[in-house]
């Protein structure tokens, strides 16, 4: 079913980076959306067992994001919250970040996703430090560089 990441403001960058880490390091499907963007249509795909990470900003609309987390859990989703203050009450898994001002949270809120992507790759028996289909340097715009990979395996 893959993973969904939701965030607002500067944490949207961490959410997008987490999606890339999930795809490149853990070699699993993932989607990153703004929290408000998710609420305008994609929410229709919510099903039992869906895995969602929500980055929280203690100073910007956190109460809305906590309500969303609660609603997702009521629909059977597994919700991970990453942020500061007050998320324990939702019953979701909560990774509390050290206290920093909202403007600087983006510096640290990617760290849990980095650790989790590496761990998921190991649990799945995948090497998070190598690419299966892509060379480290993309040299042309066409295809998937499979010829480069065939040369490596020969």
Set out the residue ranges of the language-model regions.
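A SIS-like phosphosugar-recognition module
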Residues: 1-154
């Amino acid at each position: 079913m893959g993973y969904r990441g939701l965030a607002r403001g500067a944490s949207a960058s961490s959410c997008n980076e987490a999606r890339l880490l999930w795809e490149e390091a853990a070699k699993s499907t993932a989607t990153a959306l703004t929290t408000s963007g998710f609420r305008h249509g994609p929410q229709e795909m919510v099903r039992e067992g869906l895995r969602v990470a929500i980055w929280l900003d203690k100073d910007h609309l956190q109460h809305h994001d906590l309500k969303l987390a609660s609603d997702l859990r009521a629909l059977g989703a597994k919700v991970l919250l990453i942020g500061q203050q007050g998320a324990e009450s939702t019953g979701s898994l909560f990774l509390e970040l050290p206290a920093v001002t909202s403007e600087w949270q983006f510096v640290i809120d990617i760290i849990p996703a980095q650790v989790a992507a590496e761990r998921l790759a190991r649990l799945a028996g995948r090497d998070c430090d190598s690419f299966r289909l892509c060379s480290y340097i993309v040299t042309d715009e066409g295809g998937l560089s499979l010829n480069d990979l065939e040369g490596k395996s020969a």
